[in-house]
Amino acid sequence: MSARGQDIVSIIKEQIKEFGAPVSMTSVGSVIEVGDGIARIHGLSNAKYNELLEFPGGVMGIALNLEEDSVAAVILGDDANIKEGDEVKATGRISEITVGKGMIGRVVDPLGRPLDGKGPIKAETVRPLERIAPNVVDRKSVNTPVQTGIKAIDAMIPIGRGQRELIIGDRSTGKTAIALDTIINQKGGDLVCIYVAIGQKASKVARTVALLEQYGAMEHTIVVAANSSDAVALQYLAPYAGCAIGEEFMEQGQDALVVYDDLTKHAWAYRQLSLLLRRPPGREAYPGDVFYLHSRLLERAARLNDKLGGGSLTALPIIETQAGDVSAYVPTNVISITDGQIYLEPDMFNSGIRPAVNVGISVSRVGSSAQTKAMKKVASKLKMDMGQYRELAAFAQFGTSELDKATRMQLERGQRITEVLKQGQYQPVPMANQVAILYAALNGYLDSVEVAKVRDFESGLYRFLEANFASVLNNITKENAISAETETALKTALDDYKKGLVV
């Protein structure tokens, strides 16, 4: 054999030695029953809970019931083309979503697929939708405020970074408006916002996105949408997807805010899934683990300690009540999980007091720890004063002729403070401006102003301060406190403003 032939033989032998047919093991099952978005699959004996399964045509599903000889899975899409006998593959992956800065400004579904027509999302990291919440050692006490821009909330029910604050009330009482105001108020700040729309009409989600774009809030916001027309499984996954996106920012040492709008529809979706999966129903036909459904979600909101970067994830879950019944099953569950609640009252809303925050029922268990020193100094007694005013106002309905002078003055001032706390929708007020108007209201500068002219007084005061005493507002913003010098300057400003004001 020639030298060239020997070379060819040696090359062939080397290639034979290196040859190894790639072999991959895939767990495969077959559909034995399908309907109502649920597929029962024979086989897949090694499937894991929450594992992604692949159906023909690229439709995905999630294994939720692991039985002795079958698996029940929820289908994440249209089940019209899935039929008995179809092959189902286990992917070996737990339900997950792409996360990272590339998602800011985008609208996605709970699986991270874009819904806004702006092209594919640059995937930076993939995270599981569910994970164990940070333990006690990993956490740090909440002491930094989330400025909502809403006077009634920032003054009386402060929200801290890392807190879980429930927004609860009847239909159309302004729950979503409070959440959107809070998102809009973060413009130019360092808080990344995630808005999770669960079971809403697509038109309403589109209006919300357009509103956020109008106010420049999409620059720091991610929208996760599972519409009412989507598969119920996607509605079930939506809040976990939003939480996973927020956790990525938290673990990078940043601050994030996630709004779940709303967890009532989330509980309905889970109830529907559970009944279709033939799990035993309990109270109001909810499954026995409906409390765990929300506790494992909301416990993931936290303020991490400095060793872990000091990031935070703040949760604003929304619950819709029926006829003001806060003692129903799901509302009481979520109230017991969260660190406080903002209760919106229909009667107050209908009487023109908006935001319709009922101070008596609303509470923030973090309290003044999450307030700036300036707001704490000005508004420390505001909640108690407003509570007393409401009681007096109810009593005074029977007539004020026999009330003493001090009580009548308290009623008069309470009316003016109520007017001050009113606020237009999507008009967040900067913290320094809030401090200025509340200082004026609580120190008698509004006592001589007619109730009907309080709103004009307020808007005029903001313009006057910005034009003539901008340094006062700047000092309050910069120091987050009111020094003796700043307070003196603020008093001078208020005196000058009142002198030039015709009331």
From Swiss-Prot:
The entry's keywords: ATP synthesis, ATP-binding, Cell membrane, CF(1), Hydrogen ion transport, Ion transport, Membrane, Nucleotide-binding, Translocase, Transport
Swiss-Prot/TrEMBL site (Required for activity) positions: S362
EC number(s) recorded for this UniProt protein: 7.1.2.2
PROSITE patterns according to UniProt: ATPASE_ALPHA_BETA
Major localization listed first in the record, in broad terms: membrane
Residues reported in the UniProt entry to bind ATP: G169, D170, R171, S172, T173, G174, K175, T176
Membrane topology: Peripheral membrane protein
Superkingdom: Bacteria
Reaction catalysis annotation: ATP + H2O + 4 H(+)(in) = ADP + phosphate + 5 H(+)(out)
First-level EC class: translocase
GO molecular function, one term: proton-transporting ATP synthase activity, rotational mechanism
Gene Ontology CC: one annotated term: proton-transporting ATP synthase complex
InterPro entries in alphabetical order: ATP_synth_asu-like_sf, ATP_synth_asu_C, ATP_synth_asu_C_sf, ATP_synth_F1_a_nt-bd_dom, ATP_synth_F1_asu, ATPase_a/bsu_AS, ATPase_F1/V1/A1_a/bsu_N, ATPase_F1/V1/A1_a/bsu_N_sf
Entry's localization field: Cell membrane
Any Pfam family hit: ATP-synt_ab_C
Family statement drawn from the similarity comment of this UniProt entry: Belongs to the ATPase alpha/beta chains family.
Role noted for this protein: Produces ATP from ADP in the presence of a proton gradient across the membrane. The alpha chain is a regulatory subunit.
UniProt subunit comment: F-type ATPases have 2 components, CF(1) - the catalytic core - and CF(0) - the membrane proton channel. CF(1) has five subunits: alpha(3), beta(3), gamma(1), delta(1), epsilon(1). CF(0) has three main subunits: a(1), b(2) and c(9-12). The alpha and beta chains form an alternating ring which encloses part of the gamma chain. CF(1) is attached to CF(0) by a central stalk formed by the gamma and epsilon chains, while a peripheral stalk is formed by the delta and b chains.
Protein's name according to its UniProt entry: ATP synthase subunit alpha
Organism: Dehalococcoides mccartyi (strain ATCC BAA-2266 / KCTC 15142 / 195) (Dehalococcoides ethenogenes (strain 195))
